[in-house]
Structure formats: C-alpha cells, structure tokens
C-alpha cells in the first residue's frame, strides 16, 4: 500500500497506531457468535468516527488493531469511546454476559498503543500471524506439565 496522507479541512495527516486491548479479567470470551458480533461493533464504531481499520485480528483474549486515527481525536479519547460504546453494545446484544462481567464493563482498563512509521509492514504481518504464534506457544507450554523423569513406555 502506498503511503498516502489523508486530508481534513486545513490538515494533511498520516497517523497510524498499533493498539492492543483485552476483555476484563483477560477472559477468553472472543469466539464464535461473540467474535462476529464484536468485530461488527468495532467496525461500526470506527466508521462512525472516521477511523480506518488498516489491519485487525480478534484473539480469544485480546484485540489487535492497526488503525489510522484523524488528528482531531486523541488516541485516549478514541479508545475511551471505542471501549465504552462497544461494551454497552455488546451487553445489549448479549445480555447473558452480564453474569460473567457485571457492571457492563466488558473491556479491562487500559490498552497498549504504539505509533507506526516505517515498520507498518512488519506490524501488519505480526497482527496477521498472531494467532499462529499463540497456537505454537500453547503447544510448547504443554510440555512443562509433563514429568521429565517418567519413561516413554
């Protein structure tokens, strides 16, 4: 993708961020119908604010997004909006989740953010391959529960 600056009335801008955030208690809840619903809600809220999702991936227990946020919004105000509104919309659509989370707080406090410059391709690849890497790490971590002193036979 060619690097193109976006435009507002008197501004040319190219503000890209890699953002990661998690459900409350880092619960592994983003799957099946929840995954599809959360994806649609996040897309809808981003479109409403004029935030372009360049790359994104929903894992069971966290969300990776590469986004382009207009400079009229701070990252913190956008994330407050995204997490706050999406929580309300998720609980409206899936009322049974209130028993797992309570208080209509779906997301944990805070988030990770980094700016994206020349390493955009690297970050895109990282987001795309995140699930594969997590699966490989899970397979490696299974061995730690095996007793090394027991024989094979």
Segments and roles (model prediction):
Residues 1-153:
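Basic nucleic-acid-binding interfaces
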């Amino acid at each position: 993708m060619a690097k193109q600056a976006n435009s507002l009335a008197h501004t040319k801008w190219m503000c890209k961020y890699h953002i990661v955030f998690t459900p409350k208690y880092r619960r592994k809840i983003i799957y099946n119908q929840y995954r599809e619903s959360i994806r649609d809600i996040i897309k809808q809220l981003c479109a409403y604010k004029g935030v372009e999702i360049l790359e994104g991936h929903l894992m069971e227990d966290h969300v990776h997004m590469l986004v382009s946020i207009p400079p009229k919004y701070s990252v913190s105000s956008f994330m407050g909006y995204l997490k706050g509104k999406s929580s309300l919309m998720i609980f409206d659509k899936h009322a049974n989740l209130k028993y797992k989370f309570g208080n209509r707080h779906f997301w944990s406090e805070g988030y990770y953010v980094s700016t994206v410059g020349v390493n955009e391709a690297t970050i895109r690849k990282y987001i795309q391959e995140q699930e594969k890497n997590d699966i490989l790490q899970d397979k490696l971590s299974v061995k730690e529960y095996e007793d090394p002193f027991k024989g094979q036979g």
